[in-house]
Curated annotation (Swiss-Prot):
InterPro entries: ConA-like_dom_sf, MAM_dom, MAM_domain-containing. The keyword Signal applies. Its main location: secreted. It is found in: Secreted, Extracellular space, Extracellular matrix. Glycans are attached at residues 134, 329, 524. This is MAM domain-containing protein 2. Residues 665-686 are annotated as: Disordered.
Length: 686
């Protein structure tokens, strides 16, 4: 049977009966298996003959929701959640189609995390495969249907199944084939082999799982090949959680010299990367292949066979598995993102400098009105080159990163700031060095940059040999030797530019795309504005955002307000939960007439808000980090209130808001604080 996408998932109708389904699963044969409709929304209706639940226009209007909530679940091991569903729309184009969303609700979080969302209509059942990371926390699965436009719109759920393991694993014994799909080609395609399937063109092997003619596997052969380089692709489900480890599978080749069997990854931007290729003709036995696999963001695994002609034989595939440890054939040290990151709050981490020469200097700056502090907190440590101790003409400062394994894609992110008014050519550059400190390549150098603004740089690279990332600062002469600062270095696997598949959780917002789930309360009040760069009024407000230096932040424009006027920015309603929560955000209060910035907790049905945190007056020219800890068992909202000060130099800004479960680390003791800057206005502590 041909595995073209839609035909494959139709076979999901033959999944195991409800009696065999594990916790968090349901086949909707007679009931909803512990999944309950949430009373605040429309109910999901169980079909009279069983088999599925649905919502449609017979009882719902456009925009109305139906929500299904599971009982408490636990997943101490990695799990795969598979959802068989169908969305129907009326014929023709629809501007507002129906939508199906799946959330995870952890017991200690006040918001739900979106795991998957689709508006894809179909005339048959489709299957979604979603990775659930192992956790010690209890959680619930929440499935939300939003009815779209059209008098025949509907959403139906046929089955939910949660099983231990990774979604990219498959032995091809179940009819849904783990969500793997064949990319249809008129001449060559992947087929299901074994069991009752027969093929008159090739003598195909027994499967690997059971070593039996009754077991199943996937295969592709060249019998219908008409042209050179006919290609067949078998595509895995998209990963939905970050993973790194060893991908293994079993394969057989016939006439291996006339075909090419390869494995690729493909991210959501469509970027392919080859991670494995067969290097021998093979034999009439199952061969084990192991390959290092890293998916720091959503991607697919593609098993591809290219035939050179009609005598290209066949390729068979079985028992795809994944382990979060490195392959047995892996040589050298494994990669660790923790070992390759540093905010310089406690020394240089795993970075080091040349032994000769003064090099980079680790410094900190107290909050003041003239010199920016570090990027991490505004008052912490960072590295500074070309200081009064190192600015001799011809000086070169090198900061070496830890060793990185070869043949892997890396993303380097760091923040830098330029100070002074001198020329900046080659003030900061990033090089790739081989293990023996031989220069490989310059991969980045600073261009013109705003002075005193922490800018984020991103660099993607891949080298076949082990390498080190080296940050180099050059002081050519007195007139070409500006101060350069470096902070918050991270090196991670993957491409920096891979697009995000899902929006950030409701508890996080950088304001770079929009205002997220925040809303304004404008009754008798002024407004928060979303802006970038400098604010319109001189000598107040930030020069750039905290996230990247060129992104967006929220601020009040004091020149549009009167003294004492307030602006409110409200979070979305948050669920009450036991335990503490930590609210982290960055604030900017610079200007001689700066007023107040306050954070309030607004409980549902309470007429008054509770003050959680406040700062009064001018604080610093830097973005400063705030940590706010609170508890609330009732439904509530967080309110950011900015109050205009005595003059137009009173712009106040916030950025990078994040809400997390648990207490804050390094919590400040004071709720309210007045002006917080240093009396030593321009002091650098070496």
């Amino acid at each position: 049977m041909l595995l073209e996408g839609v035909l494959l998932v139709v076979q999901a109708l033959q999944l195991a009966s409800a009696l065999d389904l594990p916790a968090g699963s349901c086949a909707f044969e007679e009931d909803t298996c512990g999944f309950d409709s949430v009373f605040a929304f429309l109910p999901w209706i169980l079909n009279e003959e069983g088999h599925y639940v649905y919502m449609d226009t017979s009882f719902a209007r456009q925009g109305e929701k139906a929500v299904l909530l599971s009982s408490d679940l636990q997943a101490e091991e990695w799990n795969c959640l598979r959802l068989v569903y169908q969305i129907t729309t009326p014929p023709g184009s629809v501007s507002d189609p129906s939508q199906l969303n799946l959330y995870v609700r952890f017991e200690d979080e006040s918001f739900d995390r979106l795991l998957w969302s689709t508006k894809e209509p179909s005339d048959s059942w489709l299957i979604a495969s979603l990775d659930l990371q192992n956790t010690s926390k209890k959680f619930k699965i929440l499935i939300e249907g939003v009815l779209g436009q059209g008098n025949t719109a509907s959403i139906a759920l046929f089955e939910i199944k949660m099983t231990a393991g990774y979604c990219i694993e498959c032995d091809f014994e179940e009819n849904h084939l783990c969500g793997f799909v064949n990319r249809w080609n008129p001449n060559v395609n992947w087929f299901v082999g074994g069991g009752t399937a027969k093929n008159t063109h090739s003598v195909l092997p027994q499967d690997h799982t059971f070593r039996s003619e009754h077991g199943h596997y996937m295969y592709v052969d060249s019998v219908y090949v008409k042209h050179f380089q006919e290609v067949a692709q078998l595509i895995s489900p998209v990963t939905t959680a970050s993973m790194s480890g060893c991908l293994s599978f079993y394969y057989q080749l016939q006439q291996g010299n006339d075909n090419v069997f390869s494995v690729y990854t493909r991210d959501m931007a469509g970027l392919y990367e080859e991670i494995w290729k067969v290097d021998s003709p093979g034999n009439a036995a199952w061969n084990l292949a192991e390959v290092e696999f890293s998916a720091p963001y959503p991607m697919e695994v593609i098993f591809e066979v290219a035939f050179n002609g009609p005598k290209g034989g066949y390729v068979a595939l079985d028992d795809i598995s994944f382990s979060p440890v490195h392959c047995q054939n892996q040589t050298g040290l494994p990669f660790s993102a923790v070992e390759t990151s540093c905010d310089f709050e406690i020394g240089l981490c795993n970075f080091y400098q040349d032994k000769e020469g003064p090099g980079w200097t680790r410094v900190r700056v107290k909050a003041n009105m003239y010199r920016a502090g570090d990027h991490t907190t505004g008052t912490g440590h960072y590295l500074l080159a070309n200081t009064k101790f190192t600015s001799q003409p011809g000086y070169i400062g090198r900061l070496y990163g830890p060793s990185l394994p070869g043949n892997m894609q890396y993303c380097v992110r760091f923040h830098y700031a330029i100070f002074g008014f001198l020329k900046m050519s080659d003030t900061l550059a990033v090089y790739i060095f081989e293990e023996n400190h031989v220069v490989q390549e310059k991969i980045w150098s600073v261009l013109e940059s705003p002075r005193g603004v922490w800018m984020q740089a991103e660099i993607s690279f891949k080298k076949p040999m082990p390498t080190k990332v080296v940050f180099m600062s050059l002081c050519k002469s007195f007139w070409d030797c500006g101060l350069v600062a470096l902070d918050d270095i991270t090196i991670q696997l993957g491409n920096c530019r891979s697009p995000a598949r899902l929006p950030p959780p409701p508890g996080e917002c950088t304001f770079d795309q929009d205002e997220c789930a925040f809303t304004q309360e404008k009754r008798n009040r002024s407004s928060w504005h979303r802006g970038r760069g400098e604010t319109p009024t001189s000598y107040t407000g930030p020069k750039g955002d905290h996230t990247t230096g060129v992104g967006y932040y929220m601020y009040i424009e004091a020149s549009h307000m009167v003294y004492g006027q307030k602006a409110h920015l409200l979070s979305q309603p948050l669920r009450g939960v036991p335990g503490k929560h930590c609210l982290t955000f960055f604030y900017h209060m610079y200007g001689a007439g700066t007023g107040l910035l306050s954070v309030y907790l607004k409980r549902e049905e309470d007429s008054e808000e509770s003050l959680l945190w406040r700062r009064r007056g001018e604080q610093s020219i830097s973005w400063l980090r705030a940590l706010v800890e609170y508890s609330c068992r009732r439904r509530h909202q967080i309110i950011f209130e900015a109050t205009r000060g005595v003059s137009i130099r009173s712009d106040i800004a916030i950025d990078d808001v994040k809400l997390q479960a648990g207490p804050c680390a390094g919590m400040e003791d004071t709720t309210e604080q007045s002006s917080g800057y240093s009396e030593d206005l321009n002091e650098i502590e070496y």
